[in-house]
Amino acid sequence: MSKASNHKLDIDNLDFKRIYTFEEFELINEQLKTHTLKIDGNPVNLFEFNEGKLLPMPQNPISKEAVACEISRQLCNWNVHTRQNGIITASQGGFDFDISGQRTIRATDVAFIPKNIYRSLDHQQQWTFRGQSFTPTFVVEVAVVQEGNREFNDLDKKFREIYFATGSSVGLGWLVDPKNKQIYIYRRRVTGVVYRTLHGWNNVDGDSILPGFILKVQKIDDTISQESSESSSSESDETIDCPKCNATFSNDYDFMEHYEDSHARKWHKGE
């Protein structure tokens, strides 16, 4: 039994000034799966980890999480349709960014890991944080911010010093503010310098990191709009014939699901 297992941790009275071991960090996050803390009135079920310090991650309000899910949805569709066969993670998908040899666990709102990185991972890397560190190539944070305020400065520092740290594979990052309708794009110059550009609220492409991917901001607006909308996938008298096989369908949704599963989502051995 590990030393951390023998050490009684009072989840409700954590000391955020002390240095925790990595084993204690893992134990705390494991206990938080069935326990919720409140810090400054905000519910917390997950911590990040930086040089022994616990960094609370408050739960996302519904609109922020909905935006992150919509970005993930568009990214997942691109991943399937272009047969990238990579991995997309959401807001509890943590990575060890290994800053200056220090274990640094950060969870981005959305991340993409190419298939060549994922397929090279060993068992420990896949199922624990104890293997050799690896990072995604693309990260997204969703937040309501104002340039110059504390949260914006903290996120800007997170992009520059954590996500784009020396040795990180991250080549593209987006800070998405759906309320103020701004997207901040982070890239790394060939010199290694990280720079930020303001993109406004326009469709944005994935550069060479996500070839062919375009984030459509209107779909984000539609997702969090409180105006009513109706699905057009109801059954009708007309049938839809699949152009690649003999299957027929009575609604758009079933046809699209069939087309993706049977024709678009073909993962070939050896890819």
Predicted regions and their residues:
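Gly/Pro/Ser/Thr-rich low-complexity, intrinsically disordered segments predominantly at protein N-termini
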Residues: 1-248, 252-271
